[in-house]
């Protein structure tokens, strides 16, 4: 008699448990040193179960990073929203994005240890990243601002933030980019002038 298919809830619970276990392993041992057997052991499942959910190790890493990015964007939006009015929402959104990313142990480690994988994931998931950043900006902006500048301008801003964030996180720099003040200065000198014309003429 064939074994019954697991329910969607069971599958979701299994995936969540695997992702939770992988995140702990990555935090404790680094991305390069963690094998699927380590994740399976911590999750309390077999290696075969992991392969039913993820084709290979890189796919598991990508799923962990995707989930953490979703949470990170939501945290950034909520933090800026609760901080109250800002002198420049563009600069603050950019600065906080960099700071929060660097504070996330696994995401920051991914940049340092697996830059090639980062670029591959960007090629695959960049559209989704823009959508997440645009959604975060709509939370951050004052009421009615996103509607005033229009959907395309919000998406353009999200794209520009991500491109300049990638520059700061992935490329070496001749100027210091360590402190919030350094990042705000960089954003003012380089990021703001690069914004689409539709945004430069409207202040958030």
Annotated model-derived regions:
Residues 63, 77-103, 158-161:
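Hydrophobic alpha-helical connector segments
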Residues 18-26, 72, 76, 97:
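Short hydrophobic clusters on alpha-helical segments that form packing/core surfaces
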Residues 99-103, 159-178, 190-200:
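Amphipathic C-terminal alpha-helical segment
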Residues 48:
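Key DNA-contact positions within bacterial/archaeal DNA-binding proteins
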Residues 1-13, 175, 195-204:
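N-terminal intrinsically disordered/low-complexity leader segments
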Residues 70-73, 109, 118-148, 152-162:
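Amphipathic alpha-helical packing segments from all-alpha helical-bundle domains
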Residues 1-42, 55, 59-62, 67:
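Basic, helix-initiating cap at the start of DNA-binding domains
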């Amino acid at each position: 008699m064939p074994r019954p298919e697991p329910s969607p809830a069971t599958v979701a619970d299994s995936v969540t448990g695997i992702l939770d276990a992988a995140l702990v392993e990555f935090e404790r041992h680094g991305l390069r040193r963690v094998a699927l057997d380590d994740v399976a052991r911590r999750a309390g499942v077999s290696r075969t179960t992991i392969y039913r959910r993820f084709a290979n190790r890189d796919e598991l890493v990508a799923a962990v990073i995707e989930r953490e990015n979703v949470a990170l964007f939501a945290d950034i939006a909520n933090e800026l929203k609760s901080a109250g009015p800002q002198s420049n929402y563009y600069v603050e959104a950019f600065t906080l994005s960099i700071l929060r990313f660097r504070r996330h142990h696994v995401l920051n480690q991914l940049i340092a240890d697996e830059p090639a994988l980062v670029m591959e994931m960007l090629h695959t998931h960049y559209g989704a990243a823009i959508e997440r950043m645009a959604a975060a900006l709509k939370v951050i902006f004052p009421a009615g601002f996103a509607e005033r500048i229009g959907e395309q301008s919000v998406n353009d801003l999200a794209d520009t933030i991500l491109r300049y964030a990638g520059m700061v996180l992935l490329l070496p720099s001749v100027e210091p980019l360590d402190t919030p003040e350094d990042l705000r200065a960089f954003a003012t000198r380089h990021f703001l002038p690069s914004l689409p014309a539709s945004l430069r003429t409207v202040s958030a």
